[in-house]
Amino acid sequence: MLVVYFKTLQQNLLKHKPSHLEDELCFAVYSTQKLYNRFYSIVLKRYGLTYVQYTTMLVLWEKQRPMMVKELGERLKLDSGTLTPLLNRLEKQGWVVRNRNFEDGRCVMVELTPKALSLEHDVKHHIQDCVLPIVMTESEYRECVNVLYEISDK
């Protein structure tokens, strides 16, 4: 259903037809993003994480190794002005530690703490249990994610 909506919007954009606000892809994405941010703020509250902190943790959990701050920023599509305060808060809350690379002192490495490692399974399953049942089926969810990446990768 969402995929059909996006494809219809794409066809309308290609034809340069004027549209109503509800027909605009940008507004649909904006509205959905607001809804997800509100939802995630409630779900993640028990862990003291924001949505952006959660996505940062997902990348670190995925890698399961120390990462350069630059590499983390590239993966999250965040600049250092946004990433540094975010990492400061995660470090203060005990989720990550930062250390200078011994070989290159200019390079800062971010690494998971024992707290982060021990809570990984709990956080991921809590999110999954909350998100999938109320939003859509798992196959609809996958299809939606794929369509959004098709758009953002162009």
Stretch-by-stretch model annotation:
Residues 1-47:
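N-terminal leader segment of winged-helix/HTH proteins
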Residues 32, 36-39, 76, 119, ...:
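Alpha-helical linker/hinge and terminal dimerization helices associated
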Residues 34, 38-79:
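N-terminal helix-turn-helix DNA-binding core of bacterial DNA-binding proteins
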Residues 47-53, 82, 113, 136-139:
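Short helix-coil-helix linker/hinge
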Residues 88-146:
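Charged, amphipathic alpha-helical coiled-coil/dimerization segments
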